A protein has these predicted regions:
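Short, conserved sequence motifs used for protein processing/export or organelle targeting and
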Residues: 200-207, 212-213, 217-395
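Bacterial N-terminal signal peptides
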Residues: 1-6
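Outer-membrane beta-barrel translocator/pore domains, especially the C-terminal barrels
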Residues: 167-170, 223-225
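Short Cys/His-centered divalent metal-binding micro-motifs
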Residues: 131, 178, 215, 219
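Sequence context of c-type cytochrome heme-c attachment sites
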Residues: 10-168, 176, 182-204
Length: 395
């Protein structure tokens, strides 16, 4: 299947600087005339015309950006820290007003009543978070109409049509929330989030392959990533071999290659990937022989980096070791690759529960416990490769 590539400037331009100028303004715009239905910004309202996008969004992490994992932290963060989190987790001032007293001003509450007349049941990232500013709709170029055709039709389209912005098909559009600011904290010379920078220096960027080409194929609004096994599998290639050494030991050479990922794998400091090698007996019992970890490990206070073993695009993580094989006990060799998408959160949340659990309110503690359980459940086995023993090994 071919993908359409967008050759656009990846530097922040004036549109993006204004579009993501936090905190965002309310949707007040007296110059725009809309009906009550048109001015209703509830995602369910958008679904009347954009059903596929709505259904995809419902299952996405964008639709879950305000959940137990962030809500419990409100009790331990300062107002300033909490509101800063909301810039990306709940960009609209109207949705922020649901979870932050700072945004419960007369102007914002008026705007919320007008544009969300049925209330806001989910104050996460919504359609309007990306597509609407001051009651003007923005989006990528139409795939079916020319610019002239679109201009002719605008007056007859709902909500006065939309303003075409090519930036919607640019990686730079995603940068403000998926890349630490230049002034942000660094560990070992690297920001906590550098996915845009990681991509910018790759062949993917040089070929014009944007974030959207992989994470929004055919403009799909599920934004699949590290939590989706099939999506991750498509970007990696595991291979391994066994040889017998002169003294009878078994030499294992394994390689996990990044073949379709436009940034480091895994990006960010949150996920970890475990490459484990087992010997398995005739009863199916396994014994761990070797383990190698992919990821960027930092402490929970975000003050020290212990290691960074992530794979850069097009490169591989190699594991080579020898061991003495008990051929009577071990019948199979397994190479298992497990992904823990939320490893850092799990470690951090467990520490918070242990050290602060008794200081938290009952509701907040429950949110923390629920989030911790959810994140532990996100682990999955990405690949399992097996070779029988005895095997035909080169001498």
């Amino acid at each position: 299947m071919s993908i359409g590539l967008s050759i656009v400037s990846c530097k922040k331009d004036s549109f993006l600087s204004e579009h993501w100028n936090h905190p965002l303004s309310t949707q007040r715009n007296p110059e725009v005339q809309l009906t009550q239905i048109e001015s209703n910004l509830d995602p369910k309202q958008c679904a009347n015309c954009h059903e596929n996008q709505f259904k995809a969004w419902q299952s996405s992490f964008h639709a879950k950006s305000i959940g137990n994992g962030i809500l419990w932290q409100k009790e331990i963060l300062s107002f300033e820290e909490w509101n800063r989190c909301l810039h990306c987790h709940s960009p609209l001032p109207e949705t922020k007003a649901e979870i932050s007293e700072t945004f419960q001003t007369h102007e914002i509450l008026d705007s919320k009543r007008k544009h969300f007349p049925s209330g806001i049941s989910n104050p996460s990232i919504q359609c309007a978070s990306c597509h609407i500013r001051n009651q003007i709709w923005y989006g990528p170029p139409s795939r079916n109409l020319t610019a002239n055709q679109l201009t002719t039709l605008q007056a007859n389209l709902p909500h006065n049509g939309f303003k075409v912005q090519e930036e919607f098909e640019s990686s730079a559009f995603c940068q403000s929330c998926h890349e630490s600011p230049e002034s942000g904290q660094k560990l070992n010379g690297k920001h906590l989030m550098e996915v845009y920078q990681e991509w910018e220096n790759t062949s993917f960027a040089k070929k014009g392959i944007q974030c959207q080409n992989c994470h929004m194929p055919n403009r799909d609004h599920t934004w699949k990533g590290i939590h989706d096994p099939d999506f991750v599998r498509a970007g990696l290639q595991p291979s391994w071999s066994l040889t017998r050494t002169a003294n009878g030991e078994i030499q294992i050479d394994a390689k996990l290659k990044s073949i379709g990922i436009g940034h480091k794998f895994p990006t960010y400091l949150i996920p970890k990937v475990y490459l484990r090698f087992f010997g398995k007996n005739q009863f199916g019992n396994r014994k761990l022989i070797e383990e190698s970890i992919l990821g960027r490990l930092v402490n929970t206070n975000l003050t020290e980096e212990y290691y960074d073993t992530r794979i850069t695009p097009g490169n591989s993580h190699n594991v080579s070791f020898r061991f003495t094989l008990d051929e009577k006990a071990i019948k199979t060799l397994d190479w298992e690759i497990e992904v823990d998408p939320d490893e850092h959160y799990i470690r951090s949340f467990e520490e918070s529960l242990r050290e602060k659990g008794n200081l938290l309110s009952a509701e907040t503690k429950k949110q923390l416990q629920l989030s911790l359980s959810e994140k532990k459940d996100s682990r999955y086995v990405l690949f399992t490769l097996s070779l029988p023993v005895p095997v035909s090994l080169p001498k």
